[in-house]
Swiss-Prot record:
The keyword Metal-binding does not apply. One of its GO terms (biological process) is translation. One of its GO terms (cellular component) is ribonucleoprotein complex. This is Small ribosomal subunit protein uS11. Located on the platform of the 30S subunit, it bridges several disparate RNA helices of the 16S rRNA. Forms part of the Shine-Dalgarno cleft in the 70S ribosome. Part of the 30S ribosomal subunit. Interacts with proteins S7 and S18. Binds to IF-3. InterPro entries: Ribosomal_uS11 (IPR001971), Ribosomal_uS11_bac-type (IPR019981), Ribosomal_uS11_CS (IPR018102), Ribosomal_uS11_sf (IPR036967). PROSITE patterns: RIBOSOMAL_S11. Keywords: Ribonucleoprotein, Ribosomal protein, RNA-binding, rRNA-binding. The keyword Ribosomal protein applies. GO terms for molecular function: rRNA binding; structural constituent of ribosome. Belongs to the universal ribosomal protein uS11 family.
Length: 130
């Protein structure tokens, strides 16, 4: 017979981390928010698609706002207070995700645009004809 003390799942102790980095990847189709510590270890993440939005509703600012709120809930267990925000991509969820993180109670220390810009690298795709 197994002892009942061994049956209980051990909950991992979460380290208290004060400063974090929020990476917001805003594409035309979806928004991905990842919050990590200063070393780059992921603390939590959320996406607009994973928040219950499908199809064209994934690419709305409201979906990005809900995803940022969900990510903030996950990360607040670690005690994160200050965030550096790194925004990547041209999507519609850029600003609303930053505003949602600010409204969630984080002190935003800096906002940086890290969108990759080619110095005439790859040939762009052909123009859409609708």
């Amino acid at each position: 017979m197994i002892k009942s003390s061994n049956l209980r799942a051990r909950k991992r102790l979460k380290k208290q981390i004060l400063d974090g980095v929020a990476h917001i990847h805003a594409s035309f189709n979806n928004t991905i928010i990842t919050i990590s510590d200063k070393q780059g270890n992921t603390l939590g993440w959320a996406t607009a698609g994973g928040s219950g939005f499908r199809g064209s509703r994934k690419s709305t600012p409201f979906a990005a706002q809900i995803a940022a709120e969900r990510c903030a809930e996950i990360v607040q267990e670690y005690g994160v207070k200050n965030l550096e925000v790194m925004v990547k991509g041209p999507g519609p969820g850029r600003e609303s995700a930053v505003r949602a993180l600010n409204a969630a109670g984080f002190h935003i220390t800096s906002i940086t645009d890290v969108t990759p810009i080619p110095h005439n690298g790859c040939r762009p795709s052909k123009k859409r004809r609708v």
